[in-house]
Amino acid sequence: MRVDLFDFELPEERIALRPAEPRDSAKMLVVKSGEALDDRKVGDLPSLLRAGDVLVFNDTKVIPAQLKGIRRRGEAQAQVEATLHMRVAPDRWLAFMRPGKRIAAGDRIHFGHDGNSCFLGQLDATVIEKGEGGEALLGFDLSGPFLDEALHAVGHIPLPPYIASKRDDDERDRADYQTIYAREEGAVAAPTAGLHFTPELFAALDAKGVERHFVTLHVGAGTFLPVKADDTADHKMHAEIGSVSRETADALNAAKARGGRIIAVGTTSLRLLESAAREDGTVPAWSGPTDIFITPGYRFRTADMLMTNFHLPRSTLFMLVSAFSGLDTMGAAYAHAIANRYRFYSYGDASLLYRAEMSDG
């Protein structure tokens, strides 16, 4: 499909720079093909669900994966930034480097020299390989938990580009850009639909008889990469590592068997479920990398509903929601959201989408 089919005008002021307070006070647009759009609040979610429904959350935890450093090559040096996006060994990460042209295989990079202290006072790495598009494989001098400790000391929360271009990250982001149920460290971007949930909302959902279960997909920085191709067939997704436990798989299959609805909280949860699912829609225990890229025409096998934030024009995530609820439906929903001053992107408002039986896109 042509990528420009997923383009729309988004006023810059509609991009949220901070989350709503409290988290569950954010707006939520309910979108069901063929029915009127319904303006609600995230706190209304329990009233829109029924006993026996299942919410599926991504419990990945964001790490401070943005690093500022100095590249040294002999006597020459230059400032560089690295955004880690996939761990491939206890001491090795794939990273997007800026500016990529300043690094080469064999370079030494000294991180943590921007005023922060870190474990042993420094965090050094060697460029093992240089890939395409500014990507590089970094081998750190520290490994395992020692590397993790150093990253927490010197790293910054990797805010999405459209937010980072407006302001620097701060201590507040370390809490704001993390779900309250995050537990499995490894993401460099938050599963942002989950940011809306509070203990009070969980209690209300429990009282309604709505189940919640967890999967893990370590969201990579590739989620922010722009689609540069003119056709979706020419876009390549970066792989992310995920897993579905036996406990969660059994719970989802049991819920579907008794007629309960599966509600994916966030596109990351949905992409992982679709990666794991069998043809008949059942979900096995699963783990591994996924680079699934969902566009209109895709046949969904798992979720009946999707809770997700409002995404950017021409993004792979807007393509996914268009596949889920229909391109025309989502075009109308986003026009309504912009006209009614919904807040977009990672810190923005939410939508609750019903799956279209057949894409109108």
Swiss-Prot record:
It is an enzyme of class 2 (transferase). Its EC number is 2.4.99.17. GO terms for biological process: queuosine biosynthetic process; tRNA wobble guanine modification. NCBIfam families: PRK00147.1, queA. It is found in: Cytoplasm. Belongs to the QueA family. Its main location: cytoplasm. GO terms for molecular function: S-adenosylmethionine:tRNA ribosyltransferase-isomerase activity. Pathway: tRNA modification; tRNA-queuosine biosynthesis. InterPro entries: QueA (IPR003699), QueA_dom1 (IPR042118), QueA_dom2 (IPR042119), QueA_sf (IPR036100). Monomer. This is S-adenosylmethionine:tRNA ribosyltransferase-isomerase. It catalyses: 7-aminomethyl-7-carbaguanosine(34) in tRNA + S-adenosyl-L-methionine = epoxyqueuosine(34) in tRNA + adenine + L-methionine + 2 H(+). PANTHER family: S-ADENOSYLMETHIONINE:TRNA RIBOSYLTRANSFERASE-ISOMERASE. Keywords: Cytoplasm, Queuosine biosynthesis, S-adenosyl-L-methionine, Transferase. Transfers and isomerizes the ribose moiety from AdoMet to the 7-aminomethyl group of 7-deazaguanine (preQ1-tRNA) to give epoxyqueuosine (oQ-tRNA). One of its GO terms (cellular component) is cytoplasm. It comes from Mesorhizobium japonicum (strain LMG 29417 / CECT 9101 / MAFF 303099).
